[in-house]
Amino acid sequence: KVLVFFVATILVAWQCHAYDMFPLRMNTGYGARTPEVKCASWRLAVEAHNIFGFETIPEECVEATKEYIHGEQYRSDSKTVNQQAYFYARDLEVHPKDTFVFSIDGTVLSNIPYYKKHGYGVEKFNSTLYDEWVNKGNAPALPETLKNYNKLVSLGFKIIFLSGRTLDKQAVTEANLKKAGYHTWEKLILKDPQDPSTPNAVSYKTAAREKLIRQGYNIVGIIGDQWSDLLGGHRGESRTFKLPNPCTTFSSSFTSQQSSLLPIYLYVIRCVQIGALASLYVVSAVCQQVM
C-alpha cells in the first residue's frame, strides 16, 4: 500500500511539473520580443499565436517583411492554406446549408496596399486612416483566396463573409468584393458598433456564428488571417484555416492576464486529473488489503 501511494505521488508530481518543461506558450508572453530571435522566427511565432498582443512589428524586421510579401513566399504560404481548404472541401458530401465562412480584410481582400504606405506594420495601427483607405473600395483580391472561393462555389458551398467592418461600410464593401472578383455570396455580415454584447472580435464572430447555426447553416470551414477569426465557440463541424498576415495580428479576446493564465488553467486541470487517478490507485490498494 505504501509503495502504491509513493508511486502515485511521484506520478502526480511529474505530471504537474511537466508544464515547466513543456509550456503551451512561449514564456516571453504577451507581445514580448526576444532580440536574438530572427525575423522569420518571430513571424512564425506570431502566426502560431505564441507571440500576440503587439502593436507593431519589430523595426528591424521591416526589410524582411517587405521581402516576404513581395517575394514568392507570402503567396506560396497563402496558396498552401487555400489548397488545404479546397482538398478538405472536395472530399465532403455537400448539403444545401453547408457553408464556408470567410473573413474579408487580409483574407479575401488584400490590405497590403495600405500597409505598404504605412511602414509594413511598423507604424501603430490607425483606424481612421485605415477606414479612409477602406472607403475608397480599391482593395485587390488575394489571388489564392479568390481561386479557392471560385472552387468552393463550384462545389456548391454557401459563402458567408463575416467581417469586423462596420455596418456603414456595407455598400463600399459589396462593391469592392464584386470589383475584386467575388460576385456571389449567401450573406455579408458586418459589425454593429453600437452592440455592447460583442466588445471584441472573438465575441462578435462567435455570436454571429451562433446566429448562423440557429438559422440552419452548417459551418464546415472557416478561413481567416486573424486568430480572432478562428477562436471562440459555435464553429459547427468546421475546420479552420489560418492564412498568413505579415503586417499585423490584432489582439484576440484574451487580455494579457487571461492569456498568461490559460496554460496554468490547463496545467491545474491536468494535475487534478492525475491526482484523481492516483487516488483511485490508493483506494484500490486499500480495498485489496482489507479484502
Curated annotation (Swiss-Prot):
<protein>
    <recommendedName>
        <fullName>Stem 31 kDa glycoprotein</fullName>
    </recommendedName>
</protein>
<comment type="function">
    <text>May function as somatic storage protein during early seedling development.</text>
</comment>
<keyword id="KW-0732">Signal</keyword>
<dbReference type="InterPro" id="IPR023214">
    <property type="entry name" value="HAD_sf"/>
</dbReference>
<keyword id="KW-0708">Seed storage protein</keyword>
<dbReference type="GO" id="GO:0045735">
    <property type="term" value="F:nutrient reservoir activity"/>
</dbReference>
<dbReference type="InterPro" id="IPR036412">
    <property type="entry name" value="HAD-like_sf"/>
</dbReference>
<dbReference type="InterPro" id="IPR005519">
    <property type="entry name" value="Acid_phosphat_B-like"/>
</dbReference>
<dbReference type="InterPro" id="IPR011267">
    <property type="entry name" value="Veg_Stor_Prot"/>
</dbReference>
<feature type="glycosylation site" description="N-linked (GlcNAc...) asparagine">
    <location>
        <position position="126"/>
    </location>
</feature>
<keyword id="KW-0758">Storage protein</keyword>
<dbReference type="Pfam" id="PF03767">
    <property type="entry name" value="Acid_phosphat_B"/>
</dbReference>
<dbReference type="InterPro" id="IPR014403">
    <property type="entry name" value="APS1/VSP"/>
</dbReference>
<keyword id="KW-0325">Glycoprotein</keyword>
